[in-house]
Amino acid sequence: MSTESMIRDVELAEEALSKTAGGSQGSGRCLCLSLFSFFLVAGGTTLFCLLHFGVIGPQREEFPTGYSIISPLAQTLRSSSKTSSNKPVAHVVANLSTQGQLRWLNTYANTLLANSVKLEDNQLVVPTDGLYLIYSQVLFRGQGCPSTHLFLTHTISRIAVSYPSKVNLLSAIKSPCQRETPEGAEAKPWYEPIYQGGVFQLEKGDRLSAEINLPDYLDFAKSGQVYFGIIAL
């Protein structure tokens, strides 16, 4: 109910009492009722103003300066993004000068061997036990399609300390040619990238290799198109 409605109701009540009450006794009662109504209206108006302008209301929980509420999901994401600088990591690229074979190098720009990871015999050597992200990409390029089927393979293998036999961790095969290029037709160039990646539990001393079956088709036109790496998680 608004303040104007309350005042109007009080006035109507006073008028009704004035008509029915008589003598000094009636006047006294009207005076008491008027005073009571005045204080009631004044109190209601004051309470309305205090609530409207937020002077009083539900108590709000206060926190020290600089303290923020973070959801459990946000805390998990924040902690997982803080990777330790002493974790093993490696990123090597293909040697562009070794046509006809895939040889990995860590001496080019944007390559990395950190925290005890080694590159030996064209293999990455794992320095500590743990979970690792293993990834590799190769890019094949050709001109036209031969009469025989052309299959391109890319395999990431592991030679474990506990089981010294080569085991394929990731493997992919692609065929860029659907049919032979007709005799006399223009031999159009084709490109076929293969990317692979996965997370594996590795042991200290494990050796990892990334190999292909037809290195003559590798595209060495630009550095960074063919690479191999691991990241400790």
UniProtKB/Swiss-Prot annotation:
GO terms for biological process: extrinsic apoptotic signaling pathway via death domain receptors; immune response; necroptotic signaling pathway; positive regulation of canonical NF-kappaB signal transduction; positive regulation of extrinsic apoptotic signaling pathway; positive regulation of NF-kappaB transcription factor activity; positive regulation of transcription by RNA polymerase II; regulation of biological quality. The keyword Membrane applies. It comes from the Eukaryota. PROSITE patterns: THD_1 (PS00251), THD_2 (PS50049). The record marks 34-35, 49-52, 77-78 as: Cleavage. It is found in: Cell membrane. Residues 1-35 are cytoplasmic. It is a single-pass type II membrane protein. Cytokine that binds to TNFRSF1A/TNFR1 and TNFRSF1B/TNFBR. It is mainly secreted by macrophages and can induce cell death of certain tumor cell lines. It is potent pyrogen causing fever by direct action or by stimulation of interleukin-1 secretion and is implicated in the induction of cachexia, Under certain conditions it can stimulate cell proliferation and induce cell differentiation. Induces insulin resistance in adipocytes via inhibition of insulin-induced IRS1 tyrosine phosphorylation and insulin-induced glucose uptake. The TNF intracellular domain (ICD) form induces IL12 production in dendritic cells. Homotrimer. Interacts with SPPL2B. This is Tumor necrosis factor. It comes from Tursiops truncatus (Atlantic bottle-nosed dolphin).
